[in-house]
């Protein structure tokens, strides 16, 4: 079981990859899951827009798309591919007054929370997602 990081025609490098993987393992455990094979693919805004159209039928930009490959039959191991648009993450960081790395960590944990079953489609579930992101970002600060 591993966390892997890839680039899809972009040059982003996530710092502290091992520490990030350990943090994500703790997040999954806190949510009642075990972290399995999870891949992060960093890509452009255009690439994620194309994927959003093709796979989800949405014609808009987004910062993250999570594909869940977890086997829910009797196991609590999560697995999946998490595609992150580094351009939109940087734009969002500026908009929200965060650093690019802080916003990237938020999006990274957001993907794992989706694998753990957290939805964000309604105002209520979106607020729950945001509270969990904040909680686990505090975990990160303790890891540093």
Identify the residue ranges that each predicted region occupies.
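An acidic/histidine-cluster motif and surrounding catalytic segment
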Residues: 1-105, 115-144
């Amino acid at each position: 079981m591993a966390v892997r990081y890839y680039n899809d025609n972009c040059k982003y490098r996530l710092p502290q990859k091992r520490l990030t993987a350990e943090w994500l393992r703790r997040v999954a455990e806190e949510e009642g899951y075990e972290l399995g094979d999870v891949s992060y693919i960093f890509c452009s805004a255009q690439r994620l827009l194309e994927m959003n159209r093709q796979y989800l039928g949405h014609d808009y930009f987004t910062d993250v798309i999570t594909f869940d490959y977890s086997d829910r039959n009797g196991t609590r191991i999560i697995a999946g591919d998490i595609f992150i648009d580094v351009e939109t993450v940087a734009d969002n960081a500026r908009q929200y007054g965060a650093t690019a790395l802080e916003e990237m960590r938020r999006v990274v944990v957001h993907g794992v929370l989706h694998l753990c079953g957290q939805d964000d489609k309604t105002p209520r579930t979106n607020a729950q997602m945001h509270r969990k992101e904040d909680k686990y970002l505090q975990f990160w600060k303790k890891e540093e």
